[in-house]
A protein has these predicted regions:
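Acidic-and-aromatic substrate-binding clefts and catalytic sites of carbohydrate-active enzymes
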Residues: 22-24, 42-52, 76-81, 109-112, ...
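Acidic (Asp/Glu)-rich catalytic clusters
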Residues: 5-6, 34-35, 54-66, 88-97, ...
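Beta/alpha (TIM)-barrel catalytic core signal, keyed to glycine-rich beta->alpha loops juxtaposed to Asp/Glu
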Residues: 107-272
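N-terminal binding-site loop/beta-alpha segment at the start of enzyme catalytic domains
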Residues: 1-67, 270-272
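Short, acidic/polar
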Residues: 22-34, 79-94, 115, 142-143, ...
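Short, well-ordered coil/turn segments that N-cap beta-strands
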Residues: 9-14, 38-40, 62-67, 96-100, ...
Length: 272
């Protein structure tokens, strides 16, 4: 597994996303991923699966310090006490003393960003959180967060795949040493049936999904958290570091005009 290094922190370039996984299904997927060699797991308070994620990590034959664990603050947990209390509750559910990365899950125009960040800084100071970041922030909001927080903003987690443009944010992250984490990296399944990805994959003996993931992690400061509960797909999603796309292939794969493959919710609410 290759890593992305930002601000001196080394993070697995591919992790497991757990959105819409719950209960035993989530626990099995996380356990399988860890057995296969995944060392990065992404969850959120809003997913309702922190207990399942924590249970899987707790019994895995992997040291906790070797797993890069991310969770996210629920939209309702924005004021000072709510940030502190909800994060400590997350730690209990996750059966851990700390998370490697705590994100603000999404911008909230009626919440005070500075208050949220101040509380997150406190969590870093007390050792409950190693690093902080944001999710679904555009450049303007990301810059504001970086300007205010005492702790460096390590990452911005956003929707990104070959059919969804993030050029301005990518440039900002590369210049400022911030990791861009791509969620929904397979375009909600749209990548798996794409002819361009299929044709490129045929040259390397790779699936369209593997080509889409390779396209992401081959970019500067970019990582991805594909979701899967299938052992076969979990393993396949890891096998993207034994080939390299040409510049021409990278350009051909990027087709943001096909953003119609995104879900209706994301079309309505992104970019922020």
């Amino acid at each position: 597994m290759e890593h992305v290094t930002v601000q001196g922190v080394s993070i697995p370039a591919i992790g497991l996303g757990t959105w819409r996984m719950t209960g035993p299904t989530c626990r099995r997927a996380v356990s399988t991923a860890l057995d296969l060699g995944y060392r990065r797991i992404d969850t959120a308070q809003a997913y309702g699966n922190e207990r399942a994620v924590g249970a899987a990590i707790d019994v895995a034959d992997v040291d906790r310090e070797d797993v890069f664990l991310t969770t996210k603050l629920d939209a309702s947990n924005r004021d000072h006490d709510a940030v502190l209390d909800s994060t400590r509750e997350s730690l209990d559910r996750l059966r851990t003393e700390y998370v490697d990365l705590l994100l603000i899950h999404q911008p909230n125009p009626i919440a005070d960003l500075e208050t949220t960040l101040d509380a997150m800084d406190e969590l870093v100071d007390e050792g409950s959180v190693e690093h902080i970041g944001v999710s679904n922030f555009g450049v303007e909001r990301l810059h504001a967060a970086r300007e205010h927080a005492d702790s460096p903003i390590l990452a911005d987690q956003v929707q990104y795949h070959p059919f969804w443009e993030q050029t301005t944010l990518l440039d900002y992250c590369a210049i400022n040493d911030v990791m861009l984490t791509a969620y929904s990296p397979l375009a909600h399944g749209g990548a798996t049936a794409d002819d361009v990805l299929r044709d490129v994959g045929a040259r390397y003996g790779k699936t369209p999904a593997q080509v889409a993931l390779r396209w992401l992690v081959q970019q500067d400061k970019v990582s991805a958290i594909p979701k899967s509960t299938s052992p076969e797909h979990l393993e396949a999603n890891r096998q993207v570091f034994d080939f390299e796309l040409t510049d021409e292939e990278m350009d051909a794969i990027a087709r943001p005009s096909l953003s119609r493959t995104a879900s209706s919710f994301l079309r309505q609410h992104l970019p922020f």
